[in-house]
Amino acid sequence: MSAVLRWGRRHGLRVVAVVVFALLALGLAPESWRAAGAATLPRLSPLLNLFGALAAREWVGWTILLGVPLLVVSFFWGRVFCWRLCPMGFLAELAGKLNPWGRGWVQRVPALNEVFALFIVVTAAFGYPLFLWLDPLCIFNGFFVAWRTPLTVASASIGTMFVVVMVLAALVPNMWCHKLCPLGGLQQAVMEFARWLRRPRGARVRNEEGPQVLTAASTSRRSFLGNVGIAIGTSITLGGAGLALKGTKRGAQALRPPSADVERINALCARCGNCMKACPYELIHPDLGETGFDGFLSPVIHFRSKIPNWDPDEDRYCFQDCVKCTQVCPTGALRPITVEQKHAMPIGRAEVLKDKCLAWAKGEYCAVCDEYCPYKAVKLEKRNGVNCPVIDPDKCRGCGACEGACPGDPVAIIVRPLSSVV
């Protein structure tokens, strides 16, 4: 019993933190502040919050300040968040206890966490931050998104990085926290910078009768400045390559959530899954290869034609008064918008497949798409004595109401990305 009490005193706060963060990630907070709770967890990370805003070049709201306390704490107390509150760190530590024989391996691996963190900071200045998806709070949040209902291969894929980290922690204990985690690396860099500012005079002393004597403070400074140099040099190269790639369209286009665009999603999306969890109609899914490598696991919208077991009697589309997905993005990949702004912001355009349409192909009366369209974007034109649907491109917003309601099997009207509509 005494051993249990000692473990509880030592790790009680960490257990509470894991439970609280898991409840936030699962969206089990009270309804009145569920959206705010969903966005809070990833926004506690300055890598996602502050440097995401830097890359976006815009103010994303007062929630940006949620990332400041961790930097302040790191400046004065170092990596205290890692050892006391980080849910990924605690779970990785527990996984590492399964393999006490693997602890020696971690000493042979160079520490890359500071380099990863500085990559993110420097490349954010280029507007194309790298390794955002390695943020531990993002990984933790994404894992719990996988448990939304219904569970599918697509929804589960967003949590794969969590499994990878846990397996790595079990095989090589301490590898993730000590060598790879960029949030830990950022705290380490801030701590070393603070030591550099507080360095005592004469910390670096030259012995007249021999070589220079380096104290621990000067060694820490040398390590810090060396990592900064490596990160800046590599980031300039990779960031420049990212800027060049931003103007290159690769792979097919896909439907994106409101306020999104291809370049912004590819540059800023951390794959945290918040937008997928926030969508009340379960229309947002991780990209499993539709848009190429750079869009992998970023959010795409799927309507009836891409969702199996769709119930055509279910009122399920991108509702004109819903902007929840844009309110929970921690990096600014999805700009926060109002309902009024959404009305002027099409995400795609419907296209009638005339060879499958009951009216066009068979001359049968059917005006379901016209009846269900909330934007009145479907016009009926008389052809051979039958009213046939035609899309008004100036009114269509690509909400998917027509696609979901179409009685055809296969569906005779689908929403396409704007860039692919002829």
Q: Which functions belong to the PLM regions below?
A:
Residues 1-422:
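Non-ligating segments of multi-cofactor redox enzymes
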